[in-house]
């Protein structure tokens, strides 16, 4: 079953800690997320990591952040 990714403006989170994911995540770094309602129901986030691929990580490792629209356009990996 394919997960539908809804086309919304890019969302970003800041990594608070990388416990258990030291190779994939850097604390205090901003990451883009992809909407995934099924993952969110399991307290997970679909995050685009250092490799440019999206993976599921525990939502507790991140905090959502609001960015100015101009910065969102600059940081968005896919538009």
Predicted stretch roles:
Residues 1-3:
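Short, Lys/Arg-enriched N-terminal segments with co-localized hydrophobic residues
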Residues 14-57:
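Basic/aromatic-rich interaction segments and small domains that mediate binding to polyanionic partners
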Residues 56-79:
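C-terminal structural segments of small proteins and small subunits
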Residues 7-13:
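Short structural boundary motif marking the start of a folded domain
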């Amino acid at each position: 079953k394919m997960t539908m990714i809804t086309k919304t403006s890019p969302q970003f989170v800041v990594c608070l800690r990388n416990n258990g994911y030291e190779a994939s995540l850097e604390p205090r770094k901003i990451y883009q997320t992809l909407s995934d309602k099924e993952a969110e129901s399991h307290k997970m986030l679909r995050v685009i990591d250092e490799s440019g691929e999206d993976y599921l990580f525990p939502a507790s490792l991140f905090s959502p952040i609001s960015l100015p629209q101009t910065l969102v356009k600059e940081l968005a990996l896919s538009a």
